[in-house]
Amino acid sequence: MVAVVVFEFSGLRCQPLRRALRLTKEFSLYDKKIGRNDPCWCGSQIKYKKCHLFRDKQEPMKHWEVNREFNNVNSRKKCSCPDSFNENCAGNIIRAHTVPKTSSLKAISDAGHVLGLKMSYEAIRKNKGRPLLEKIGINHASTFNGFCKYHDDVIFAPLEKESFVASQKQCFLLAYRAFAREYYAKEGAQDLSTLRHGADKGKHIEAQFDIQMNNFLYELGNRAAIEDLKHHKNYFDLSLENDDFSTARAVIFTFDEAPPVMVCGGINPDFDFNGNPVQDLMDLLKRTDSLSVTSYYDGEKGVIAFSWLENSDDTCCKVMASLLDKDREDYVPIIIQYMFKNFENVFVSPKWWESESEGNRNILMKLFGDNISTDISPNANGITKPLSVYNFPQLREVITVGYPLSTEP
């Protein structure tokens, strides 16, 4: 069977298999000559002789080289504010907390530490790609080099220095902080493209093909995600520039105490809480709707917020309506499962984690594993019904902001 893959996306033409490769459905290779000066079969747009010719004889990358590049990308510095704000950037780029340190992380910490997923290359290698909650100091948990000191202070002051009253501005800022981190992470993944491309050095041709095919599909998905993020950034920037937050939407769950699970992240939901598809993430020519989830503690009450902007109403209103249609006692377990299933920027109270049964911990780690695995197809497992009962602060009220869904507290 002959397979030819040609994709056009955002002006980039990718043709990794246009020349040289004929495949069976098991992806094994048939011999076919490729000229030394032809574009390489991997889609790099580099001549074959300077790319994959004799790739099997090249020295594999050293672990320390991979770790160095990984750390360089994940420690790069930028201010994520709108371009029109750049002239006001002041002070150093700081390691901004996506989950507030003093009010939130400290509230659930034990001896200054929380449990979280370490994202360094060394940690991933040590754990063989398996998710593992490890101790992280609250000075380092949830941080990224995404804002200068001035804009981090000024933009997020209504969250950091005021009690949470579920204003549209505060709900907007919850969504914006999660969005900024996701944009930073996706740009970082794009910057690691060269590193991924060299991962097949020293390997035989069949392994080279498998690695480059996976790379190609990953790159395609990541580029699509970046285009989505650019689309949404226009809306976030416009609200900040005009100081107009009327497009912010949110469903807020408040609690008597700090949530023992802290999260800050954004997703493009593909299923609602009944397991129904709500948007097709495989349609790369269509911009997808975006939803942010944040939990934190303002010193008086715990908050878990689902927030988005008006341009994502079509999907997000369906998703949240399906959650609010559940029995009230099911809200918390489903939300906990949703956080573990969809986000890696999750931080857990060590004491809470130890208080949960081994069965509960296994359920959540299974969902966590589904989240970070590239081998598991998208599914609604864990978000349609409670898989267990978890210890959690008392749910106080449910508040909707900016759109006409209502529920009784």
Region locations from a protein language model:
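Intrinsically disordered, low-complexity linkers and tails
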Residues: V2-N37, L53-W64, F70-V73, K77
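Generic recognition of flexible, low-complexity loop/linker segments
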Residues: S28-Y30, N37-D38, N67-R68, R249-I252, ...
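Short Cys/His-rich zinc-binding micro-motifs
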Residues: Y30-I46, S80-S84
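Short Cys/His-based metal-binding microdomains
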Residues: D38-C40, I46-R55, K101-T102
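An N-terminal structural lobe/cap that precedes and organizes the functional/catalytic core
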Residues: L53-D153, A157-L159
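Composition- and surface-driven signal marking solvent-exposed, interaction-prone regions
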Residues: F54, K161-E162, V319-A321
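Internal, well-ordered alpha/beta segment that forms a basic, Gly-enriched binding/recognition surface
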Residues: G112-L217
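Charge-dense, low-complexity intrinsically disordered regions
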Residues: G221-P409
